[in-house]
A protein has these predicted regions:
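N-terminal targeting signals for export/organelle localization
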Residues: 1-64, 194
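Hydrophobic alpha-helical transmembrane segments of integral membrane proteins
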Residues: 23-24, 96-97, 152
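Short gly/ser/thr-rich secondary-structure transition/capping motifs
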Residues: 43-45, 64-71, 138-141
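A short beta-strand-turn-helix
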Residues: 61-84
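Short pre-active-site segment immediately N-terminal to redox-active cysteine/selenocysteine motifs
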Residues: 81-83, 87-91, 154
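Hydrophobic beta-strand core positions in alpha/beta domains
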Residues: 84-86, 114, 160
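Structural microenvironment flanking redox-active thiols in thiol-disulfide oxidoreductases
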Residues: 96-132, 142-148
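Thiol/disulfide oxidoreductase modules built on the thioredoxin-like
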Residues: 129-134, 141-192
Length: 194
């Protein structure tokens, strides 16, 4: 075998052939970018979806009380104290999961308000009577309009509210002891000191 036989001669690539290669290359690259973006999105924590309302005043609203409760909930009620607003429903399985933690927060003296989302009045009242009522005030958002204004994706969701009625934090999904201890309670303590 001589040195000349190891080299092949290639004719310059025609324009048609270059277009054909490019036509196959672009979709492969686009698919790769799509797969990477999808993989990145799947690995994000859905509880950390940023809210456009962070740092802004709570939306203006006024809700009647849940059946059997004396006090409804309005935006005016969220001024003066650092508080939590918990969006819940009697039909929500995850709400039942976090409920004992809300009862503990009430026992610890924290101000926790409830926003009952798209619920049957009798079911909401029965649920609170059965599992306990951790809320200082509870508004019935029967049609879900107020929850939409708050940017609620589903239940449960919990908001930390500053003394001057601004949204400081949004937690999506059921509260956990770990989440309370690592994020929500330290934030509330800091806001109380301000």
């Amino acid at each position: 075998m001589n040195a000349e036989s190891t080299f092949e001669l290639h004719a310059p690539m025609s324009k048609g052939r270059r277009k054909l290669r490019l036509r196959h290359f672009v979709p492969v690259v686009a698919f790769g970018v799509l797969v990477l973006t999808f993989g990145w999105a799947l690995n994000r924590n859905p509880r950390e979806i940023p809210s456009a309302l962070i740092g802004k005043p709570v939306p203006h609203f006024s809700l009647a009380p849940v059946k059997g409760r004396a006090l409804g909930l309005s935006s005016a009620d969220l001024i003066g104290n650092v508080s939590l607003v918990n969006v819940f429903a009697s039909w929500c399985v995850a709400c039942r999961e976090e409920h004992p933690l809300l009862m503990q927060l009430k026992s610890a003296g924290l101000v926790v308000h409830g926003l009952d989302y798209k619920d049957n009045p009798d079911d909401a009242a029965k649920w609170l009577d059965t599992f306990g009522d951790p809320y200082t005030r509870t508004g019935a958002d029967r049609n879900g309009r107020v929850a939409i204004d708050w940017g609620v994706y589903g239940v449960p969701e919990t908001f930390v509210i500053t003394k001057d009625g601004r949204i400081a934090h949004k937690h999506i999904g059921p509260l956990t002891a770990e989440g309370l201890e690592s994020t929500i309670l330290p934030l509330m303590r800091r806001l109380v000191r301000q």
